[in-house]
Regions:
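Conserved HGGG/HGGXW glycine-rich cap/lid loop of the alpha/beta-hydrolase fold
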Residues: 17-58
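Conserved loop-alpha-helix segment in the C-terminal half of the alpha/beta-hydrolase fold
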Residues: 207-235, 239-242
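Post-His helix in hydrolase/transferase enzymes
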Residues: 242-254
């Protein structure tokens, strides 16, 4: 069912779920700070790791860091914490990450949520899913540090910084973001495990402002597991966890 939803009333998430929220490119685990207490107050466990090269792991940034590194980060956390029945949420670039994670440990994943995210097929890279990504790689290649892409610049309203326009929020976000390794955008997704197909999926699209050049693949009406697609929309910019944390949390709990 395709819907625009602002205040869902029925909660269908189990009494206690495990949410694993994976940030996108340039960000780190702190971007979920406004969402975490809302999910925890509803009785759920929440994990918001920073991937290698970001946040508390920024010192590990190197040319060798790639998509596979980030997949290993999440799989390792799942095993170390012995997590099962995980609601795995991937924002933006992390749509690639959660796809490969599900491919490795499908038995531990209860639900996949693609949050304004790249939705790949097996063997695809970020460039395949979002062609404008190649422009960022080319730009990096002409710099002194060809192996990494600096954070995107703030754009004039209504686009702002990743869809964030409030000055205080922009300043907070600007202090958080860091360079993105090019290898993350070039390594292919592994999505060839048939067991992944049975995992239900939800897609949440941020439709408030969409800069030119950004494309979104249509979501098939039927999920791989045969059930109707679940697609929700939020009338805000890309970083909805910052601009609409309450509404996002309501969707995650639905």
């Amino acid at each position: 069912m395709f819907s625009r939803l602002h205040s869902p009333k029925r909660k269908t998430v189990p009494i206690m779920s495990i949410f694993l929220l994976v940030h996108g490119a340039w960000h780190n685990g702190r971007c979920w700070e406004r969402v975490v207490p809302l999910l925890e107050s509803a009785g759920h466990r929440v994990f918001t790791p920073s991937l290698t090269g970001y946040g508390d792991k920024a010192h590990l940034l190197s040319p060798e860091v790639g998509l596979d590194t980030h997949v290993e980060d999440v799989v390792r956390l799942i095993h170390e914490e012995d997590l099962t029945e995980v609601v795995l949420v991937g924002h933006s670039y992390a749509g690639l990450v959660i796809s490969s994670v599900a491919n490795e440990v499908p038995e531990r994943i209860a639900h996949l949520v693609y949050l304004d995210a790249m939705v790949p097929e097996h063997g695809e890279t970020a460039v395949d899913v979002q062609p404008m990504t190649q422009n960022l790689i080319d730009l990096a290649a002409r710099s002194d540090s060809a192996w990494r892409v600096p954070p995107l610049p703030e754009m004039p309203p209504p686009f702002g910084l990743f869809g964030v326009t409030d000055p205080a929020d922009v300043a907070w976000l600007r202090a958080m973001v860091s360079d993105q390794p090019v290898r993350c955008l070039q390594q292919p997704v592994r999505l060839d495990n048939p067991a992944v197909n049975v995992i239900p999926r939800t897609h949440i699209h941020c439709v408030g402002v969409e800069p030119e050049g950004i494309t979104r693949r249509p979501v098939p009406a039927i999920q791989p597991n045969g059930s109707p697609a679940r697609v929700w929309e939020l009338p805000t910019g890309h970083d909805c966890m910052i601009t609409m944390p309450t509404e996002l949390s309501e969707l995650l709990l639905k």
